[in-house]
């Protein structure tokens, strides 16, 4: 659907890079839909560090899935300070640093992409996403939330529930 929308749009000066973990039937359908259109490139099986480098070198990250509840690709973009855009699915509307497409039409896609061609807009969104990632999704933030949750289960009278005293003793060394 995304490839068809781009092909119907007036977006001519933008290259869309697909980072695909494996070549499969869906990827082959994408290749057929792309044909010889020079606006699209597919990279398969990149090592983790190269995926991060590709994201950091991008102007924006796009997710065109309606089935993701909390997409890791968007969280990766946020961690790199790269703006993103995606259809309104799952928890995307609660994330900062991107544009949620309320309407999955070629014109909505074109408008979002065109807005992200502005460097000030990209920097503003990217920094908002990075701040939210650091506060809520970075490993230190997640560990702190888990620690608070685990320790909140200790009973007020000082009698810990089963295993919480073991967790308290060993958590700082984990």
Question: What are the language-model segments listed below?
Answer:
Residues 86, 98-107, 114-120:
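Conserved acidic donor-binding segment of nucleotide-sugar-dependent glycosyltransferases
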Residues 14-28, 44:
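Glycosyltransferase donor-sugar binding loop
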């Amino acid at each position: 659907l995304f490839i068809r929308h781009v092909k119907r749009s007036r977006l001519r000066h933008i290259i869309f890079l697909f980072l695909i973990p494996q070549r499969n039937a869906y990827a082959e359908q994408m290749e057929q839909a792309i044909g010889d259109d020079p606006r699209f490139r597919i990279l398969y099986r990149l090592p983790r560090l190269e995926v991060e480098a590709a994201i950091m070198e991008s102007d924006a990250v796009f997710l065109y899935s309606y089935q993701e509840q909390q997409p890791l690709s968007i969280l990766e973009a946020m961690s790199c300070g790269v703006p993103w855009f995606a259809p309104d699915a799952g928890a995307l509307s609660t994330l900062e640093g991107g544009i949620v497409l309320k309407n999955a039409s070629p014109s909505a896609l074109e408008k979002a992409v065109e807005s992200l061609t502005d460097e000030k807009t990209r920097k503003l969104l990217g920094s908002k996403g990075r701040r939210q990632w650091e506060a809520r999704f970075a490993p230190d933030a997640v560990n702190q939330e888990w620690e608070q949750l685990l320790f909140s289960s200790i009973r007020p009278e000082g009698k810990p529930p089963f295993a919480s005293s073991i967790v308290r003793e060993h958590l700082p060394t984990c």
